[in-house]
């Protein structure tokens, strides 16, 4: 759309001394219509004092003449039309001296980053060549073309992406597991006879990205590093691990023994990237689908790691943070920090803000192995891997991204410290009781930005103007939260105290940002126009000069219109051609002789004048100075925010925890949950317990609640009943309620008395592992062995069908022996669902074993599953009836009944 000068800001009256609606002229300043673009900073500041700008006053930082409708970024490239097949598929096939200067530089950078996809800025595109072009074309389904590399070589593969779409395409590559090196232009005008200066400005890897579009908002993005010591005759396998979410600054280290423990931890962590210095590309302890990034062993050496830690955290000694006690973990965090530094080329005074490593000790959290996490469907469904249908989906009422991440971490690592659990539960209970408080807090939390990640981007020097505005908005809400919390939740977790009395420095920072940046700044910093008027005298002076130029352009349009007699003449601007006078074809005969034809279009002619061309240069230089000054002011502000990243994150984590607790309270209040009584004994007593997920998925029928009683003299429950009657659901709901209680949540039951568990084991369902050469039965036995080796009297064990993958008597014998061991030697609290009705006899042999059954009502040939668990053992499994209900052909069902009758006889 073309914008006429009439009715625009250019239509303002010519500024004269004391004219209405204009700033007064100053006698000793240059005439604005003869403006000198080389005014000194002092002159410009003087102008700003003489003609002060008010906040939100219109700025001249962007072109204000009419905009040409064809003023679009040129996204055409050379070398894209030839159909010749590129001849060279890999950069190593050629000698660098044979290549053109651009390709030679590309190859030099590629040799420094061989493991990464190199995107090389050429004009409006990021290009890839050789093997990277083939990769980019294949993975992103882009056209593979070629570029001429000289007569001796011919064409080489080339593929590219528009620079404005780089983040989206890089995000796709990161999600596919690739690392990306971005080579950008560092100057706009090359030195005479030289190429534009280019260099690597960002290295993006799955574990170190900071960009919002490359991260999952409600999930931590873990980068991990591991150091292992193989087992010897004198010591077991030992390992140290460091994990960091570079986007939030969270850093943890741990050191343990046993390769199984390492495998389980990595399976839970689901790190985006795992660093290690070994040669094996697929070590046995590494779960599938974890991306291994090999590194040199040097960063992991003890001396190198200590030096990196001392420098990064500006410490004199590591003793104060306890790392010498976990030497393997110390080496792991050293390698991780070195990698982060190598992949983050930062501006001066910028550093990715990372917390001092927190040591995770044994016994801090409830142990959940990978099988249990899958069976209980904590964060994803077992069949489809979807969030919907998982526990997290059912109870996540958080309103912020950081609150969502916090709740996920709590579910993945429930607490074992009773006092810490009760502190969370106390807050949940208080918020359930105080509905107005809960609703007010949720209203304040809803618009809160992701302060954790925003602060990280500011500290690393990657934050934009909108990021800083979001930080200020979030910080300005802290006093409102404090006012609501005052005297309300004082007996909650210690970290919540950060919200009761927000740091004054954070409020001062928020005020500074709000007074400096406009509320809705442009996305790109290069556009300018995001700093308020009145912030900086030099910037105000430049804007005054630009306003004067706008007035000159408006006057020039009027003069040329009057002089030519062309009433439809317009003065417009094009990003490539600059300022010009646009005249329709019908009026070209009236064009004055001193006009110079600039461009001919289908319906109009475009002209310039020497005076307009000269003034254009002045305007462009003033605008460039204004944009540069805005950027300088912004960088100063961003550094100021970055220095406060640690304090911002401390407040952000308190907000995240409050969001998680408020969400749990909302679930409890609206879903008829109860506050469990937590004990230090082994009791697990539930009245009218329900499955927190299934009851939400049921639409037409209500969920049937059931009781549970374990631990008070009853260690093993043998659960029998028909197929498809709900035994597996009953097992899972027990495990989920135990877990929710240790998260600090209320639970879906009428009443609950729950002793703290050290581990939850589940063996529900059966799958084979063909890749590992294991049958269904072998997988079942391996899982059972894991339980028997690691369960204690404080563990909760949930078993569904052991021994069914082999001969009947073999399976029964195994199931019997496992049951005896759990009830006798271990005394682990166990519910064992089985179709081996012979196991009901155990209750007559052991006082701590009880029989329960899932009830079914049989009327003629029909079965009605009641889903009610009652004392006693079932004598039938109704397998044939279940087969009929599943749609097995009637002839097969009838024959099965005949065979069953014969076997019974």
Swiss-Prot record:
Family: Belongs to the DNA mismatch repair MutS family.
UniProt GO molecular function: ATP binding; ATP-dependent DNA damage sensor activity; damaged DNA binding; mismatched DNA binding
Family matches, as SUPFAM superfamilies: DNA repair protein MutS, domain I, DNA repair protein MutS, domain II, DNA repair protein MutS, domain III, P-loop containing nucleoside triphosphate hydrolases
Domain of life per record: Bacteria
Descriptive protein name: DNA mismatch repair protein MutS
Keyword DNA-binding set for record: yes
Pfam families: MutS_I, MutS_II, MutS_III, MutS_IV, MutS_V
UniProt keyword Manganese present: no
Function: This protein is involved in the repair of mismatches in DNA. It is possible that it carries out the mismatch recognition step. This protein has a weak ATPase activity.
GO cellular component: cytosol
Keywords recorded for this protein, A-Z: ATP-binding, DNA damage, DNA repair, DNA-binding, Nucleotide-binding
GO biological process, one term: mismatch repair
InterPro entries: DNA_mismatch_repair_MutS, DNA_mismatch_repair_MutS-lik_N, DNA_mismatch_repair_MutS/MSH, DNA_mismatch_repair_MutS_C, DNA_mismatch_repair_MutS_clamp, DNA_mismatch_repair_MutS_core, DNA_mismatch_repair_MutS_N, DNA_mismatch_repair_MutS_sf
Region (Disordered): 1-95
UniProt source species: Synechococcus sp. (strain CC9902)
Binding site for ATP: 721-728
Extent of Basic and acidic residues compositional bias: 38-50
HAMAP family, per the entry: MutS
